């Protein structure tokens, strides 16, 4: 999955969703219109997807393509998050990992982060785990969130009282961090944890 660019991934997802909804694949012009690119640009994406083995096309025939490798449940792993002190935000695509559909919330984007540190061990989130994050910009008290403060990202339990946000570790040996609410940006809520045994 590392071989797909972000745009190619989006084009492939669009093709899969279009086929599921309509029963036939989109035309080159429909792809171009959806992504606000030229038909030639759309065609180049299709050629790249074909070369990489994700679709098969029959030259010269409109709508003559089929998906040979689905990425519907492949979620981007976009780096590490510190379960400890804040860490500089690093969002770069490392890989795509297939996640069972039952873990995914319909209508939401998701991403994976690799956990570094031990501040969430009492919630059974350990160093080296992958956390599945549902992308959203809000949280309820007690939610485990990926949050950004001053350009740095951390994984903590979220609590808000008035205009103060507490980012609380799940480790009795560590202290909470307190911030003005406007300084805290919620990136998403943790909805799953994956661990290699």
From Swiss-Prot:
Family according to the record: Belongs to the peptidase S24 family.
Taxon lineage: Bacteria, Thermotogati, Thermotogota, Thermotogae, Thermotogales
Gene Ontology terms for molecular function: DNA binding; serine-type endopeptidase activity
Function statement: Represses a number of genes involved in the response to DNA damage (SOS response), including recA and lexA. In the presence of single-stranded DNA, RecA interacts with LexA causing an autocatalytic cleavage which disrupts the DNA-binding part of LexA, leading to derepression of the SOS regulon and eventually DNA repair.
Record text on subunit structure and interactions: Homodimer.
Designated name of the protein: LexA repressor
Keyword list, A-Z: Autocatalytic cleavage, DNA damage, DNA repair, DNA replication, DNA-binding, Hydrolase, Repressor, SOS response, Transcription, Transcription regulation
One of the GO biological process terms: DNA repair
The species this protein was found in: Thermotoga sp. (strain RQ2)
